[in-house]
A protein has these predicted regions:
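Non-cofactor substrate-recognition interfaces
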Residues: 2-8, 15-260
Length: 260
């Protein structure tokens, strides 16, 4: 029986990379559960998937004794009910909605491109675009899948790992093996770059190639954080005269909190 909106609960120590997410990784041999419960922040009905062995980190034991229908927003103990059990292998291949639909995944189409990239470009020329002399293909339909990864553990987190191929060797390796595209920006020089620039801020739309923006960027969604620094520590606002004001930075709301 459907209970609210279904979610995978993913784990990351770098929330600012979430807009670059293109996959979720599970351990094939890990046991997972589907839990009907409520969002403790807004009281909405939700169904969540996470590793069975990590349930105690997020759900109080008393919650299993309370009927879902008896919950009132604000109650200290949130009720829950386990309604399904799966192995990670059974979850592989499931699709999900892009968490932050700012930019669509894409890849460069050249001799070094993966076979799946070349195939999509050949079968869907309408999804291809050119910046300078380089050809790219938009790959939204090929991303946002659950993929396997033997390195996923249940030592902490949820047993589900957020994958952003442009931020980390492990992410790039497991994504490539599963045929998952990357998500990056293309500047006006035609250079491909991660969403975050070298000074720690999201690229502005004006810095990007117009062909790339037209094909892959949701300007309305992206505009809310374009140009924002991903950590207060990187912002000139807290680095006046070469001196970092740690106290002020810690008091102000950090982007890692804002986007979550």
């Amino acid at each position: 029986t459907q209970w609210g909106t279904p979610y995978f609960i993913a784990w990351t120590t770098t929330p600012w990379t979430l807009p670059s997410n293109t996959a979720l990784c599970v351990g094939p041999k890990i046991n997972y559960v589907c839990v009907q419960t409520y969002n403790p922040y807004n009281g909405e009905k939700i169904s969540v998937v996470l590793a069975e062995s990590r349930m105690s980190a997020y759900f109080k034991a008393d919650g299993a004794k309370i009927a879902l229908e008896d919950y009132n927003p604000g109650d200290k103990v949130v009720p829950y009910k386990v309604v399904g059990k799966y192995t990670g292998e059974e979850l592989v291949g499931m699709r999900y909605t892009q968490l932050m639909p700012w930019v669509k995944p894409l890849e460069k189409v050249d001799d070094l491109a993966a076979d799946f990239v070349k195939k999509v470009a050949e079968e869907h020329p309408e999804r291809c675009f050119t910046v300078g002399t380089d050809r790219f293909v938009e790959l939204e339909a090929e991303g946002f899948r659950v993929i396997p990864g033997d390195y996923v553990t249940t030592d902490d987190g949820t047993g589900i790992v957020h994958i952003a191929p442009t931020f980390g060797a492990d992410d790039a390796k497991v994504a490539k093996a599963a045929g998952i595209p990357s998500l990056f920006m293309i500047n006006k020089k035609g250079e491909t770059r991660p969403m975050v620039d070298l000074v720690g801020k999201y690229y502005t739309i004006d810095e990007c190639a117009p062909e790339f923006v037209a094909a892959c960027v949701n300007e309305e969604n992206y505009a809310h954080h374009a140009g924002d620094f991903v950590k207060n520590a990187y912002s000139p606002k807290y680095n006046v005269g070469g001196k970092y004001d740690a106290e002020a930075a810690e008091k102000d709301e950090d982007l890692n909190i804002v986007i979550c």
